[in-house]
Amino acid sequence: MAVQRTFSIIKPDAVAKNVIGKITTRFEEAGLKIVASKIKQLSKAEAEGFYAEHSERGFFGDLVAFMTSGPVVVQVLEGENAIALNRELMGATNPKEAAAGTIRADFAESIDANAVHGSDSEAAAAREIAYFFAATEVTTR
């Protein structure tokens, strides 16, 4: 097993429900360390840039509108197999298909307002972390 870093967003729907602490507690109780974190209001340009890979898909406009509808929490998580572990904690993208006890099953409203985002690969994690954090903003604990 390897120590990895992964990127996480607590999305506007979860921030609005005031469950930031409940979600981060799940990360920490599963052995992930939060090594960078900030709350921010994404601009339209930031959201479009972050989700650029989806720009040709029909849901892109709605995704950007949702991600700019309120503040988000962007975080870097570190731990053994952090990418896979975070994805397991989040549950399926569609909360109706997410296993009981996962973040999305417990806190998400819909496939669009699904509480959290997590990197799906090492390459994505590196790209996503660099998009929001300078190297000097990420620490080791």
Curated annotation (Swiss-Prot):
The protein's organism comes out as Pseudomonas putida (strain W619)
Q: Which cofactor does it need?
A: Mg(2+)
| Localization of this protein | Cytoplasm
Cell inner membrane as a keyword?
no
Which InterPro entries does the record cross-reference, listed alphabetically?
A: NDK-like_dom, NDK-like_dom_sf, Nucleoside_diP_kinase, Nucleoside_diP_kinase_AS
Q: What's in the keyword line of the UniProt record? A: ATP-binding, Cytoplasm, Kinase, Magnesium, Metal-binding, Nucleotide metabolism, Nucleotide-binding, Phosphoprotein, Transferase
What family does the Swiss-Prot or TrEMBL record give for this protein? Belongs to the NDK family.
Tell me how this protein assembles: Homotetramer.
Name of the protein: Nucleoside diphosphate kinase
Binding residue positions for ATP: K11, F59, R87, T93, R104, N114
